[in-house]
Amino acid sequence: MTVSEIRVRKINPRAKIPKRQSEGAAGYDIHSVESGRIPPNGRKSVRTGLAWDVPQSVVGLVFGRSGLALRNWIEVVETCVHPGEDKELVITLVNNGREVFEYEESSRIAQLVFVPVLSCEIDLVESLDLTERGCLGFGSTGMK
């Protein structure tokens, strides 16, 4: 499946059109349209000023930016951009740090990755086929 264009509309004239910051990057950087402060252990919904029109075969997944997490303890609450939505994308940021986090208008706060959607029929069964992995997980293969 190839999708060459995804439409976006500016709801706020200060909104910045997202772009990938490096060749081969999967995520498009999303900017805030406002400045703000998030206290330690606080959260805030941050406006982007953009509404998206994604095709039926695609969903946009919002992820955090590794630098914000590493340096500022900022986490992004996962958000999806679904086909047919026409409202502003609002991103919730969580401050897991000990300091107030301040951001400015046009700050890159998250990244948006577009992925294809696979539609499946869900089949309720009494049991599942056994696999080699079975019920293992949660570190069962070790660290090295």
Swiss-Prot record:
Pfam families under this entry? dUTPase
EC number, as in UniProt: 3.6.1.23
User: Which CDD domains does this one have?
Assistant: trimeric_dUTPase (cd07557)
Give the residues the record marks as binding dUMP: 66, 133, 138-139
What is the superkingdom listed in this entry's lineage?
A: Eukaryota
Q: Which InterPro entries match?
A: dUTPase, dUTPase-like, dUTPase-like_sf, dUTPase_trimeric
Give the protein's cofactors.
Answer: Mg(2+)
Report if keyword Hydrolase is assigned.
yes
Provide this UniProt record's keywords sorted from A to Z: Hydrolase, Magnesium, Metal-binding, Nucleotide metabolism
Gene Ontology MF, one: magnesium ion binding
What is the enzyme's class at the highest EC level?
hydrolase
What is the reaction catalyzed?
dUTP + H2O = dUMP + diphosphate + H(+)
- Functional pathway: Pyrimidine metabolism; dUMP biosynthesis; dUMP from dCTP (dUTP route): step 2/2
Q: Does the keyword Nucleotide-binding apply?
A: no
A biological process from GO: dUTP catabolic process
**Family the UniProt entry places it in:** Belongs to the dUTPase family.
NCBIfam families in alphabetical order: dut (TIGR00576)
Q: What does this protein do?
A: Involved in nucleotide metabolism via production of dUMP, the immediate precursor of thymidine nucleotides, and decreases the intracellular concentration of dUTP so that uracil cannot be incorporated into DNA.
Give the record's subunit note. Homotrimer.
Q: What is this protein called?
A: Deoxyuridine 5'-triphosphate nucleotidohydrolase
Organism in which the protein naturally occurs? Encephalitozoon cuniculi (strain GB-M1) (Microsporidian parasite)
Which gene is transcribed and translated to give this protein? DUT1
